[in-house]
């Protein structure tokens, strides 16, 4: 019984190491949650920054700063906490690939 429990605990502990990065379609779907403030496909109509065409590293850095509480915000800190670093990278790459307008 201990062996089975140990195997189960080990499997749970290492599972994140085998998780795959989000696909482009998954990144697009996650990025859609940003549309209310940042516009469709990251093209803002005003009031917030556009994300379309922004370099991946810049968007990912800002999201991680929000997530860590190191960047002031009323909403973004809570939203960013809901994403893993891999998801943040995938969304940042997706926004970077969108044409800026």
Predicted regions and their residues:
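Positively charged n-region of N-terminal signal peptides that target proteins for export
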Residues: 1-4
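Gly/Gly-Pro-rich "capping" loops immediately C-terminal to redox-active cysteine motifs
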Residues: 41-71, 77-83
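The canonical Cys-X-X-Cys-His
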Residues: 32-40, 91
């Amino acid at each position: 019984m201990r062996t089975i429990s140990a195997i189960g605990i080990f499997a749970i502990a290492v599972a994140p190491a085998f998780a795959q990065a989000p696909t482009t379609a998954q990144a697009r779907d996650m990025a859609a949650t940003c549309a209310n403030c940042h516009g469709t496909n990251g093209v803002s109509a005003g009031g917030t920054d556009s994300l379309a065409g922004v370099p991946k590293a810049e968007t990912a850095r800002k999201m991680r700063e929000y997530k860590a509480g190191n960047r002031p915000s009323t909403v973004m800190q809570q939203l960013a906490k809901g994403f893993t670093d891999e998801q943040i990278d995938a969304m940042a790459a997706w926004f970077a690939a969108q044409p800026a307008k």
